[in-house]
């Protein structure tokens, strides 16, 4: 029986290292790795990609596009962890929980784009509500998110953790030009007709995301209530292994959101906070930016693709 060969192009970056750690020791696949001296050799990388059953690209956007262009073996399947192909026609979006058919689309695909960290939480909250008609596609959305500094990649981790490093600011807001590259991804896969505002920031901790989206009930159609929104999310994610929707009554009793609560896992926790008196609702998501927001999602997609590959020979 053929053992699938998996090659991680960019296995020394933050996401690549995490994927490698998650796959190491598995007997159902063979990890193809290049010697350190050959990792940046274009010819050796091209040979490795074209000899793999599945290639995981953990590269900057331009390098990911070049890697895909270098594939001449039609049997090679790709999971791209960069943002290069997340809105590209012909690529399947790698969020298995997007709808009932998405996991099967991923399983059968030859080109899968791994979701961005922030979009994972935003789309998971918004897509079911827009699809159900509870949230207008042109709602003037404001998305707020704080991530650990590992969201800035390997250079950011080294900058914060090297000996003698200056103390990091408690919070660093960025993307203030309102042109963050994740916005088109969020808009397309959440089904939005109006561009949302997105305000990200890095906290002085290593990893974990807390994302929130405020809603005014008076701007929703008909008599949509917090209970309607809650029921929609619960129904959409019923049976989802890696997505947990917190009960509404528990949310009301919670004092805060801990962005580090799910670190090390591939889980996503959604919660809805409501104040009926003020007619306001807060949608929230907590997850590991290196887990469900990156490497965990990539391995989840890989497992879906391996299942299809093994089932079909």
From Swiss-Prot:
GO BP field: L-arginine biosynthetic process
Pathway of action: Amino-acid biosynthesis; L-arginine biosynthesis; N(2)-acetyl-L-ornithine from L-glutamate: step 3/4
Keyword Cell membrane: no
CDD domains: AGPR_2_C, AGPR_2_N
Residues forming the catalytic site: 117
EC assignment: 1.2.1.38
Primary location: cytoplasm
Oxidoreductase in keyword set: yes
Gene Ontology CC terms: cytoplasm
GO terms of molecular function: N-acetyl-gamma-glutamyl-phosphate reductase activity; NAD binding
Catalysed reaction equations from the record: N-acetyl-L-glutamate 5-semialdehyde + phosphate + NADP(+) = N-acetyl-L-glutamyl 5-phosphate + NADPH + H(+)
Subcellular location: Cytoplasm
Enzyme class: oxidoreductase
Keywords: Amino-acid biosynthesis, Arginine biosynthesis, Cytoplasm, NADP, Oxidoreductase
Gene3D superfamilies per UniProt: Dihydrodipicolinate Reductase, domain 2, NAD(P)-binding Rossmann-like Domain
A Pfam family: Semialdhyde_dhC_1
Record HAMAP family: ArgC_type2
Its job: Catalyzes the NADPH-dependent reduction of N-acetyl-5-glutamyl phosphate to yield N-acetyl-L-glutamate 5-semialdehyde.
Similarity comment text for this entry: Belongs to the NAGSA dehydrogenase family. Type 2 subfamily.
Protein name (database record): N-acetyl-gamma-glutamyl-phosphate reductase 2
Provenance organism: Pseudomonas putida (strain ATCC 47054 / DSM 6125 / CFBP 8728 / NCIMB 11950 / KT2440)
Name of the encoding gene: argC2
